[in-house]
Amino acid sequence: MSLQEEIKKRRTFAIISHPDAGKTTITEQLLYFGGEIREAGTVKGKKTGNFAKSDWMDIEKQRGISVTSSVMQFDYAGKRVNILDTPGHEDFSEDTYRTLMAVDAAVMVVDSAKGIEAQTKKLFEVVKHRNIPVFTFINKLDRDGREPLDLLQELEEVLGIASYPMNWPIGMGKSFEGLYDLHNKRLELYRGDERFASLDEGDKLFGSNPFYAQVLDDIELLAEAGNEFSEQAILDGDLTPVFFGSALTNFGVQTFLDTFLEFAPEPHGHKTTTGDVIDPLNKDFSGFVFKIQANMDPRHRDRIAFVRVVSGEFERGMAVNLPRTGKGAKLSNVTQFMAESRENVENAVAGDIIGVYDTGTYQVGDTLTVGKNKFEFEPLPTFTPEIFMKVSAKNVMKQKSFHKGIEQLVQEGAIQLYKNYQTGEYMLGAVGQLQFEVFKHRMEGEYNAEVVMAPMGKKTVRWIKPEDLDERMSSSRNILAKDRFDQPVFLFENDFALRWFADKYPDVELEEKM
């Protein structure tokens, strides 16, 4: 098979949702259909010990939440599928945002009882900004939920995206009978030995069922007043195909997967800092690091840099350029993943995700190129933390482990490090409280370094150019610090302190991140 044919087989997507909408469960079912697992771990895992296969970190298994992005790959129906299962918890949205830079489509999982929730809305805005296709799976039809028409209306009003139902539920909860499949022109039955039936058999199967009569009325209404199906509108991110189903009972999931792969896009190009777009079919290898993860295998204390292959083909042992440093690197020890399990990979093509063993060479956002190519891809989003804590080693004899742990966990990008200009104290910044809890848990469990953390409350953060800095600008209303790249930064007590500073130093430019 030619390189172009291999690339065109790739389908790389992320699954996004609010916590508890069923994202991890549907990921498990997709892996089940891909033949990667014999049984899907379920949300019952916290009690049974039968943990989700895509949740590998110890704290994820304890709490039943996803706080890191997992990468999984399988072959299905002539396609090579790359799934990125993202953190649903809001405190880890920064990791999710970066992951969304590495995919060509997104699957949005919505709880049928709750509709569009806060985190779903935030993540959708990032997806919308990138203009990548969004496929919606409305989950938990095995439970009572909201009216399907209400859910479609909410998609359009809250998210501002047109929707087109690919199937329609017949009943819900205890009255759930199956799906009216508009796309495949068939019925998918929830009970009984036969899974599918023709639409002509509907009256015989459901003739006296009031829910079936309601379905026919709804479908007639949608035909008159609903949106038209358009494959181009899907690819442009203007129309979301909507699928109903139940991930927990594995109903409607395979139909979703089949139809998703029919319409999901091939790998797309990525913009460079100069505005050029690198074509995935370009034979020269290029890629970017969108995530760094320490201790995926705690026995080996390893670090993996996750790379999205943007163009061409990776071959094991190849030499690459790292434009940020002006140096080169050799990609010898490279893996692909199924959650925590991994295997060495000899080659990969545009659209694939590979894991490069990292000894401190890479940073999130790094571009990798070959030959004379020295371009860099557009930078990944970074976020200004909102809450802060002082952190120190509980045991002074563990300083070496403490510094190693802090360095590696901060490089993952889920938490940010600052150093007080005057005192040298370490301070951590995060978007939410859970990030601190995970940091403390991992420092103790993975680096054997207990930490003491003291809350500093919320701060307003602004960066300042080194040439504008005067240490006399520091006052009781702010803390002067350095970030992990040694760039000067002020942590202001509040917005009033920021305005006071801006009035006092009108010529000093303060920069805010996303």
Curated annotation (Swiss-Prot):
Record key words, sorted: Cytoplasm, GTP-binding, Nucleotide-binding, Protein biosynthesis
tr-type G domain: residues covered: 8-268
Pfam families in the record: EF-G_D2, GTP_EFTU, RF3_C
Instruction: Quote the record's binding site residues for GTP.
Output: 17-24, 85-89, 139-142
What NCBIfam families does the record point to? Answer: prfC, PRK00741.1, small_GTP
Q: What does this protein do?
A: Increases the formation of ribosomal termination complexes and stimulates activities of RF-1 and RF-2. It binds guanine nucleotides and has strong preference for UGA stop codons. It may interact directly with the ribosome. The stimulation of RF-1 and RF-2 is significantly reduced by GTP and GDP, but not by GMP.
Listed name of the protein: Peptide chain release factor 3
Question: From what organism does this protein derive?
Answer: Streptococcus suis (strain 98HAH33)
